[in-house]
Regions:
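A generic fold-level signal
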Residues: 16, 55-57, 66, 80, ...
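N-terminal strand-loop-strand
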Residues: 39-87, 114, 118
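Unchanged
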Residues: 92-115, 124-180
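Acidic, metal-coordinating catalytic segment for phosphate/diphosphate chemistry
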Residues: 10-61
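A short glycine-rich, hydrophobically flanked beta-strand micro-motif that places a catalytic Asp/Glu
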Residues: 120-122
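N-terminal short leaders/motifs
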Residues: 4-20, 90-98
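Short N-terminal helix-initiation segments at or just after the protein's N-terminus
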Residues: 1-10, 31-37, 79-89, 103-108
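Nudix hydrolase/Nudix homology domain
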Residues: 2-13, 155-204
Length: 204
């Protein structure tokens, strides 16, 4: 008999283990919690559902700050040459520690080995699709580069990686995201602005 939908939902919501999250908070600080709701387009919902089918409903996003204060950002093939860039992100594989996943994903997407420095935001997103609403979670960190050259390793997933200023990210890039009509970009614009607002509050 098929699994109980309520059981599946509970297991998906718990794809981030409480004890691992507690350890990250202890090591990198208590994040500010936010909720956001966005209407996703059909193709966006398809991508989220594909990830959900693999048992993952989260991402780890890292704002990698260089010594000059600029941030490493990526662009994917789906929106290549649009002017839209965002902080790199990715998810943990089954059984993979979240911190290890963050470091691996940052290397694959940017070519940099990074060190996490502060747990800034714990974002809870409601992905609104025509047939249902899907819960998503983003754990957002400040990070710093340790070694490497900015050059995507996973060139199938990443079209470009570069650096941008805070002003660009919260200004023209966030506006392009909001004007795109994509629910995912509306969420990323909100996440980006909240990240920098919280960074100011923390004075880091």
């Amino acid at each position: 008999m098929p699994p109980d939908p309520a059981f599946l939902m509970a297991s998906h919501l718990n794809d981030i283990k409480d004890n691992e999250l507690a350890a990250l908070k202890k090591k990198y600080g208590e994040p500010e919690v936010h909720a956001f709701t966005a209407d996703f387009r059909k193709f966006e919902c398809t991508l989220v559902k594909r990830t959900e089918a693999k048992g993952r409903l989260h991402d780890i996003t890292c704002f990698i700050r260089q010594d000059d204060g600029n941030f490493v950002v990526i662009q994917k093939p789906q929106y290549a040459r649009t002017g839209i860039y965002r902080a790199p992100s990715g998810g943990a594989n089954p059984g993979e520690p979240l911190e290890d996943a963050a470091i691996r994903e940052m290397y694959e997407e940017t070519g940099l080995t990074v060190r996490l420095t502060r747990f800034v935001l714990d974002m809870h997103l409601e992905v609104v699709c025509k047939d249902r609403t899907i819960p998503w979670r983003s754990l957002v960190f400040l990070a710093e580069p340790v070694v490497g050259e900015i050059k995507p390793v996973d060139t199938r997933e990443i079209f470009d990686a570069t650096v941008m200023s805070r002003g660009q990210l919260v200004g023209e890039v966030a506006q392009l995201m909001e004007d795109s009509g994509w629910g995912g970009f509306k969420y990323r614009a909100f996440l980006t602005r909240e990240f920098f607002r919280r960074l100011d509050e923390l004075n880091i």
